[in-house]
Amino acid sequence: MSEIKKTEKLGVKSSKHLAAGALGGFISSTTLQPLDLLKTRCQQSQRDSLPKMVRRIILHEGGVFSLWKGTLPSILRSTTGSSCYFYFLNWLRHFAPQSKNIASSHIQNLWMGGFARAAVGFAFMPVTVIKVRYESNLYSYTTIYSSIRDIWKKEGISGFFRGFGVTALRDAPHAGLYVYFYELSKQNLHKLFDRFSPSSSVQGTVPHRNIVNVMSGLISGATATAITNPFDMLKTRVQLEPHIYKNFLHSAKLVYANEGFRGFLDGFFLRVLRKSISSTITWSVYEWALHRKVIK
């Protein structure tokens, strides 16, 4: 089904999937946090140009390092979330009936990726809500603790799961489509490399395999992110201003009425850029860590 499945046959322990996923999530979250913060600001109905937004954040919110605001909850979400996601995905692949039909195998990748992400997304929803509000300038949170206390005081436990429905509508399709296109791209790129480099097997050559992983990550990341961007924008609105955006349908109607179709594209470029690179880093580091056996 995939290289991940092959490593399982070679005896890769589940703990290695946890550690490799955490490593990939940590690297992607720390390096790309500025893009995540800017994407959140774009989606909270701000009409400033990107250069103007960056300049205002740097000049009025604490300098260049203010672009990394919200890094801690991002790290907590990405490291533990990616770790659990890869563990659960590997578990599903290990126990699910294996299909010899290529089309059925791709469909398995689609539903397994979506199901694993939805389950992990629910478990880490509180961290996601805290991260989004901490990145926004709509709230005057100075610490992570102050954001937790304020949400609990004003909204109770439900506040930490605000926007889960629209988040699931974003994450499950995105993850499913990502795994689907990732494995499909790897399969086709391996064939392409083999066709033009018959003397060197891509499957067994580390540099070629890494190139294939990176290219597959970029292709699948950009495709899945572009398709699911409207759900991400609605998720951000619901989590930032729940008193205005009540739920998925209400938010969609409100955005369309006030901003038209263009409103659903808020943060599109930044999200496609960040998610494409982020997913590529996470998956490439994950597979690299497993193959290089850097995780003992």
UniProtKB/Swiss-Prot annotation:
InterPro entries: Hem25/SLC25A38, Mit_carrier, Mitochondrial_sb/sol_carrier, Mt_carrier_dom_sf
Principal location class: mitochondrion
Ranges that cross the membrane: 18-43, 70-96, 110-135, 163-186, 212-238, 267-285
Sorted UniProt keywords: Membrane, Mitochondrion, Mitochondrion inner membrane, Repeat, Transmembrane, Transmembrane helix, Transport
Residue ranges of coiled coil: none
GO molecular function, a single term: isopentenyl pyrophosphate transmembrate transporter activity
One Gene Ontology term, aspect cellular component: mitochondrion
Pfam families the record matches: Mito_carr
Reactions catalysed: glycine(in) = glycine(out)
Cell compartment(s), UniProt: Mitochondrion inner membrane
Mode of membrane association: Multi-pass membrane protein
PROSITE patterns on file: SOLCAR
Solcar repeats: 12-95, 104-188, 208-292
GO terms under biological process: glycine import into mitochondrion; isopentenyl pyrophosphate import into mitochondrion
Function: Mitochondrial glycine transporter that imports glycine into the mitochondrial matrix. Plays an important role in providing glycine for the first enzymatic step in heme biosynthesis, the condensation of glycine with succinyl-CoA to produce 5-aminolevulinate (ALA) in the mitochondrial matrix.
Family (UniProt): Belongs to the mitochondrial carrier (TC 2.A.29) family. SLC25A38 subfamily.
HAMAP family for the chain: SLC25A38 (MF_03064)
Protein name: Mitochondrial glycine transporter
Higher taxonomy: Eukaryota, Fungi, Dikarya, Ascomycota, Taphrinomycotina
